[in-house]
């Protein structure tokens, strides 16, 4: 998994992580957010590397299904990109839109 995949998965986990099982969420967070290896996660959770791999795969697939159905991350990314474009055109908007940035990035 490359860095872009990890960043994308971290965004999905942030938005939809509560919809996963506790075990999937825990293992996925260790793997993606804490940058632990499958082996390290397995040791920490007291399971096999294969169990972690299965949890990570199924969790990632579930997160993508949620995003495909809801589209919250894509919408947030599109709004942030548009705000960036607008503030690049008119720097004075940056201060006025600061609260919007905080809400979206928060």
Regions found by a protein language model. Give the residues of each.
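Helix-turn-helix/homeodomain-like alpha-helical modules used for DNA recognition
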Residues: 80-106
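Key DNA-contact positions within bacterial/archaeal DNA-binding proteins
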Residues: 50
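Short alpha-helical "recognition helix" segments of helix-turn-helix
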Residues: 41-42
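Residues within the DNA-recognition helix of helix-turn-helix
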Residues: 55-58
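C-terminal flanking helix
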Residues: 60-67
């Amino acid at each position: 998994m490359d860095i872009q995949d990890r960043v994308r998965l971290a965004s999905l986990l942030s938005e939809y992580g509560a919809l996963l099982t506790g075990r999937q969420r825990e293992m996925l967070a260790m793997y993606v957010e804490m940058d632990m290896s499958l082996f390290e996660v397995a040791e920490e959770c007291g399971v096999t590397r294969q169990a972690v791999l299965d949890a990570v795969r199924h969790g990632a697939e579930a997160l993508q299904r949620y995003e495909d159905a809801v589209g919250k991350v894509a919408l947030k990314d599109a709004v942030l990109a548009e705000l960036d474009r607008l503030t690049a055109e008119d720097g004075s908007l940056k201060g006025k839109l600061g609260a919007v940035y905080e809400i979206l990035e928060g």
